[in-house]
């Protein structure tokens, strides 16, 4: 049986760790509410701009590069959205695993993969394994803002517009105006974690560009119109300026909003994952303290029993010695 002093030291150590995990759990819980509110607040705008883009795509004859796959595409950019901090359970591991699966699939299809990362954990993960990262942005995983993610969004859109035959500027948040010249790419994929519920967060791989799978460019007969959410036909819409001009102007904004929405989802998922991990750690610490306390009590009881036995034995020995005299 372990020494009583060692057991008490372990109990103190576990209780100290438990205070940390409990504090982290409470902090993560408070952040989830804020992150969820931001995700929900972005939904009305997302819904409306998606409707507008569908109408524009249906009314426009514009062959925009963002709406179609490039023939003979050579390079694909993969943005891996990780966290800046740890203690989030399997949050980052699941993202890295999904990214590896996507990269393997792209390489099998003949693409050269260009990896980009957000979050310190992603930077450290790939650096430790000696895997190249073309660019990284950090410092906003828990609470992303439109301004902080500006360079990420601008770089990916500029790189796609340049294509693998052209060049764009890599913007790292420090040299936004100048930037570093890099080769463009023909596809943009994002690997992030989707917030489904407090208990479920799932790593997803999403093709950001081209956005052909997102916007249906089928022609809609004018007489049929488009049905709204209630199933009623919506009124005809006239575009001013023309649909082609509006589509070309709004596509970059649509892509930027889509990417920013993924950052918001990832932030909520990160807080939920950290809260679950810290709650599990706190519960495990509580159970461990209970077990150690039981063992310590048994050790203490055994120690007391031994001391009593020694006292009784000593008294008996003294008694026997007196009788013999």
Curated annotation (Swiss-Prot):
InterPro entries: ATP_synth_F1_ATPase_gsu, ATP_synth_F1_gsu, ATP_synth_F1_gsu_CS. It is a peripheral membrane protein. This is ATP synthase gamma chain. It comes from the Bacteria. Gene3D superfamilies: 3.40.1380.10, ATP synthase, gamma subunit, helix hairpin domain (1.10.287.80). F-type ATPases have 2 components, CF(1) - the catalytic core - and CF(0) - the membrane proton channel. CF(1) has five subunits: alpha(3), beta(3), gamma(1), delta(1), epsilon(1). CF(0) has three main subunits: a, b and c. It comes from Corynebacterium diphtheriae (strain ATCC 700971 / NCTC 13129 / Biotype gravis). Belongs to the ATPase gamma chain family.
């Amino acid at each position: 049986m372990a020494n009583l002093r060692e057991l008490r030291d372990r109990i103190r150590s576990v209780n100290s760790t438990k205070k940390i995990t409990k504090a982290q759990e409470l902090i993560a819980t408070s952040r989830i509410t804020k992150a969820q509110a931001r995700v929900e607040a972005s939904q009305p705008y997302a819904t409306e701009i998606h409707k507008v883009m569908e109408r524009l795509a249906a009314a426009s004859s514009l062959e925009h590069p963002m709406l179609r796959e490039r023939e003979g595409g050579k390079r694909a950019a993969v943005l891996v959205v990780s966290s800046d901090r740890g203690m989030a359970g399997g949050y980052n591991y699941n993202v890295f695993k999904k990214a590896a699966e996507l990269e393997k699939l792209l390489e099998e299809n003949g693409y050269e993969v260009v990896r980009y990362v957000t979050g310190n954990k992603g930077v450290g993960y790939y650096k430790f394994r000696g895997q190249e990262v073309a660019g990284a942005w950090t410092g906003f995983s828990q609470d992303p803002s439109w301004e902080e993610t500006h360079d990420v969004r601008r770089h990916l859109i500029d790189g796609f517009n340049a294509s693998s035959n052209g060049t764009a500027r890599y913007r790292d948040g420090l040299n936004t105006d100048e930037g570093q010249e890099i080769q463009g790419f023909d596809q943009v994929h994002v690997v992030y974690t989707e917030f489904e519920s407090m208990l479920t967060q799932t790593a997803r791989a999403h093709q950001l560009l081209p956005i052909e799978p997102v916007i249906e460019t089928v022609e809609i007969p004018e007489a049929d119109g488009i049905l709204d959410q209630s199933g009623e036909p919506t009124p005809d819409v006239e575009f001013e300026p023309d649909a082609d001009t509006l589509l070309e102007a709004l596509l970059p904004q649509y892509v930027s909003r889509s990417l920013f929405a993924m950052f918001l989802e990832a932030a909520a998922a990160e807080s939920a994952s950290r809260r679950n991990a810290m709650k599990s750690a706190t519960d495990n610490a509580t159970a461990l303290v209970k077990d150690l306390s039981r063992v310590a009590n048994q050790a203490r009881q055994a120690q007391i029993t031994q001391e009593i036995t020694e006292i009784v034995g000593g008294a008996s020995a003294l008694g026997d010695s007196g009788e013999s005299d």
